[in-house]
């Protein structure tokens, strides 16, 4: 646990995150013992609110259009800073995870979440390693501010919520998104972009042998 001038950053295990989520009023324990949460108006991914920052490393490699919508790099920086200031006034939850298990292809990610439940989700959907980033790779960062409200006129988003991937900055911004699955989809999109550049074919599947 690290003291901040305005709030605190908590790095908790799953059990403590569940307790924190309950204490914060984020959800309740269901009859089967699972933590039950509400996702708000969005019960799944929100494709119309998903963007990728268009910059030198991506401009010629991504099929831009209705699915991969471009986002201005300067607008991203301004919005990231606004969300960062918003989170600095609140208690936040840190998860240090790996996306992928292979030592050559995993991505180390620091997840900073406004809610304990989003932090817990990141620890469960990704890998919580015994040793974080042993290959000392460049780290990615996810900011998840589920209660933040974007201003489409000022921020360039399509609604009060957004999911924006910035490959050059190695950042993913989730603002106004209570559906935690956007974290998984965003980082899978990152892997699906980066791995073919290494002659590795990513597969969205699983197998028990």
Give the ranges of each region predicted by the language model:
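Glycine-rich phosphate-binding P-loop
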Residues: 207-209
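A noncatalytic interaction/capping subdomain that flanks phosphate/NTP-handling catalytic cores
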Residues: 1-205
């Amino acid at each position: 646990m690290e003291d901040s001038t305005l709030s605190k950053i908590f790095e908790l295990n799953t059990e403590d995150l569940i307790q924190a989520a309950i204490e914060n009023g984020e959800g309740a324990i269901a009859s089967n013992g699972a933590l039950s949460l509400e996702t708000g108006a969005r019960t799944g991914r929100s494709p119309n609110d998903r963007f990728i920052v268009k910059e030198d490393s991506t401009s010629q490699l991504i099929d831009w259009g209705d699915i991969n919508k471009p986002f201005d790099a300067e607008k991203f920086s301004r919005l990231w800073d606004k969300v960062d200031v918003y989170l600095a006034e609140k208690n936040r939850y840190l998860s240090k995870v790996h996306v992928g298990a292979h030592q050559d292809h995993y991505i180390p990610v620091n997840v900073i979440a406004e809610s304990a439940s989003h932090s817990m989700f990141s620890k469960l959907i990704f890998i919580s390693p015994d040793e974080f980033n042993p290959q000392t790779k460049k780290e990615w960062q996810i900011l998840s501010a589920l209660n933040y409200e974007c201003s489409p006129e000022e921020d360039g988003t399509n609604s009060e919520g957004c999911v924006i991937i910035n490959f050059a900055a190695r950042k993913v911004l989730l603002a106004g998104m209570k559906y935690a699955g956007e974290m998984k989809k965003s980082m899978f999109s990152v892997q699906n972009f980066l791995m073919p550049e290494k002659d590795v074919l990513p597969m969205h599947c699983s197998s028990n042998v």
